[in-house]
Amino acid sequence: MAKQRFERTKPHVNIGTIGHVDHGKTTLTAAITKVLAEKGKAQFMAYDAIDKAPEERERGITINTSHVEYETDARHYAHVDCPGHADYVKNMITGAAQMDGAILVVSAADGPMPQTREHILLARQVGVPAIVVFLNKCDMVDDEELLELVELEVRELLNQYEFPGDEIPFIRGSALKALEGDPKYVKAIEELMDAVDSYIPTPQRDADKPFLMPIEDVFTITGRGTVVTGRVERGKCKVGDQVEIVGLREESKTTVVTGLEMFRKILDEVQAGDNVGALLRGIEKKEVERGQVLAKPGSIKPHTKFSGAIYVLTKEEGGRHSPFFNGYRPQFYFRTTDVTGTIKLPEGVEMVMPGDNVEIAVELIHPIAIEEGLRFAVREGGRTVASGRVTKVSE
């Protein structure tokens, strides 16, 4: 069967369902596809098809995730749904599923539960920009006051984790009733998608961000100078642009790009996603190395101290068999290189077990170009023992 072409006519947004186990995340995902399928904007996926999430391995970590796609009048969506709580933790921290926004599903019959809180915290840790709430199972609650109470509790919880709890759209509905075709509840799904369309912001495209290219290799072309190669992570760069070489050294160096090539062909401009070689003016081979980045001057700084949220691999995932303690000194792998760093655990945390999710403070032995949101792997003896994301940079 020939593959269909992906038509890029609408903005693309990545979202996912989050919330406590059995509050109806997967049923809601199925209901969204059913309601939109009736408008010709999705392919209906039944609960069972989504629930049998295929097992994926992302950086050695086993994750079960279901990917569903659909569109509204305004946008094209890729939607992720995970069957188990551990899958969410791994998925969000390792960045296997980037979310531009999330639908938090809360059962009106139960109110917020422990994982409701954990998933809101996770969304905060990994920088999910916006959340819309779907109060599910409203057909089981006759008492208007009870619904208001649940809504109030969830809004307070969102405020606690620095989401604008008072502004977030709340949609009341029943995913199961919508699947059964009950018009009142089908309308609630339509309202939910309108809220997602309007409240979750369209992400800025990588091409529009400031230029950044991690350096993978450095070599000299006789008579021309030093060339660095790598894949452009974001932004654009033209011949003649000023760039800064950041990381690993005390001083960042500014230089000019005097030539760009891709697939052995010369070009004037490169952009996010391109694998390129950049010729740098007046830079000797020994002044630049793998692990540094080429960036728009002033757009990123080198740091040795940062805080991060990490997921620690289990031994089944190839991680450690034993816990680690305060002062643990593994390697931190950022973009293209490993740097040794020391881990400081939060107050009151004695040790970290395989399978845990924890916030850590790190001090690296060399400065690296880091910023909030950057993902990293924690490695020991060449194998990954944890996967994480920078939550804050200090100095």
Curated annotation (Swiss-Prot):
Molecular function as annotated in GO: GTP binding; GTPase activity; translation elongation factor activity
Catalytic activity entry: GTP + H2O = GDP + phosphate + H(+)
G1: region residues: 19-26
Record-listed Mg(2+) binding positions: T26
Keywords assigned by UniProt, alphabetized: Cytoplasm, Elongation factor, GTP-binding, Hydrolase, Magnesium, Metal-binding, Nucleotide-binding, Protein biosynthesis
GO CC annotations on file: cytosol
InterPro entries in the record: EF-Tu_GTP-bd, EF-Tu_GTPase, EFTu-like_2, EFTU_2, G_TR_CS, P-loop_NTPase, Small_GTP-bd, T_Tr_GTP-bd_dom
Domain tr-type G: 10-204
UniProt binding sites for GTP: 19-26, 81-85, 136-139
Subcellular location: Cytoplasm
Region (G5): 174-176
Coiled coil spans: none
Region span, G2: 60-64
Stretch list, region G4: 136-139
The protein's Enzyme Commission number: 3.6.5.3
PANTHER family given in the database record: ELONGATION FACTOR TU, MITOCHONDRIAL, ELONGATION FACTOR TU-RELATED
Subunit-level organization: Monomer.
Similarity comment: family membership: Belongs to the TRAFAC class translation factor GTPase superfamily. Classic translation factor GTPase family. EF-Tu/EF-1A subfamily.
NCBIfam families named in the record: EF-Tu, PRK00049.1, PRK12735.1, PRK12736.1, small_GTP
Annotated protein name in UniProt: Elongation factor Tu
Taxonomic source organism: Symbiobacterium thermophilum (strain DSM 24528 / JCM 14929 / IAM 14863 / T)
